[in-house]
Amino acid sequence: MAIHLYKTSTSSTRNGAVDSQVKSNPRNNLIYGQHHCGKGRNARGIITAGHRGGGHKRLYRKIDFRRNKKDISGRIVTIEYDPNRNAYICLIHYGDGEKRYILHPRGAIIGDTIVSGTEVPISMGNALPLTDMPLGTAIHNIEITLGKGGQLARAAGAVAKLIAKEGKSATLRLPSGEVRLISKNCSATVGQVGNVGANQQSLGRAGSKCWLGKRPVVRGVVMNPVDHPHGGGEGRAPIGRKKPTTPWGYPALGRRSRKRNKYSDRFILRRRK
């Protein structure tokens, strides 16, 4: 969808650039409520994920990441906004009467037909195993574990590429630049996730950020020493260290956070950029 620029009637909308409005009329049997009470805290009430809290109430849409409706074609009926992700979703009416939500593939329009299975065309929105796809295919919603459902390349504009197949494994280049092995029997959806311009949006004001459940971000250098290692000093003082750190004293700006000796290290051929 296109990026919409506001008319500069107020200072808050002068710098705003948001996506054009997509209506949301979810089906009652495909939604359920969520109770957001954590606000970035753990069970002891300590902040473990900063800058979270508040936000508008949301209803969770049940998304079909498994795409296990085999050899039954479905038709795209609506393209809707989902408050729980930056990608749009599609309501699919299948031939047997069932209705499901899927991620909106880029370029898909209302009335298009999709299908899942092993011997289906290599066309946008169709889901099939990696072993049945030709090399160079652009894919998204990729399974890591067979039958568990898609877990990779699900954000707006995300796309991965099938670059090799050898033995029981397929080699993929993920959106992060990581190159890794995945079982050829795992399924994926052909095409790119829609709403490619999601990263070009500018909310323009703090209130819009608040509606998304994101709290203000404060620099550590303006805090007190009890709150951050960078804090304290008289007036505008430097951080007082050779290198910046996190609020808990660990090195910041580039420290690797991935667990050492993780079981999946043997499947990663090249680390992400």
Curated annotation (Swiss-Prot):
Residues 1-23, 224-273 are annotated as: Disordered. It comes from the Eukaryota. Keywords: Chloroplast, Plastid, Ribonucleoprotein, Ribosomal protein. It is found in: Plastid, Chloroplast. Its main location: plastid. Residues 262-273 have a biased composition (Basic and acidic residues). Disulfide bonds: none annotated. SMART domains: Ribosomal_L2 (SM01383), Ribosomal_L2_C (SM01382). InterPro entries: NA-bd_OB-fold (IPR012340), Rib_uL2_dom2 (IPR014722), Ribosomal_uL2 (IPR002171), Ribosomal_uL2_bac/org-type (IPR005880), Ribosomal_uL2_C (IPR022669), Ribosomal_uL2_CS (IPR022671), Ribosomal_uL2_dom3 (IPR014726), Ribosomal_uL2_RNA-bd_dom (IPR022666). Gene3D superfamilies: 2.30.30.30, Nucleic acid-binding proteins, Ribosomal protein L2, domain 3. One of its GO terms (cellular component) is chloroplast. One of its GO terms (biological process) is mitochondrial translation. One of its GO terms (molecular function) is transferase activity. HAMAP family: Ribosomal_uL2_B. Part of the 50S ribosomal subunit. Belongs to the universal ribosomal protein uL2 family. This is Large ribosomal subunit protein uL2cz/uL2cy. It comes from Acorus calamus var. americanus.
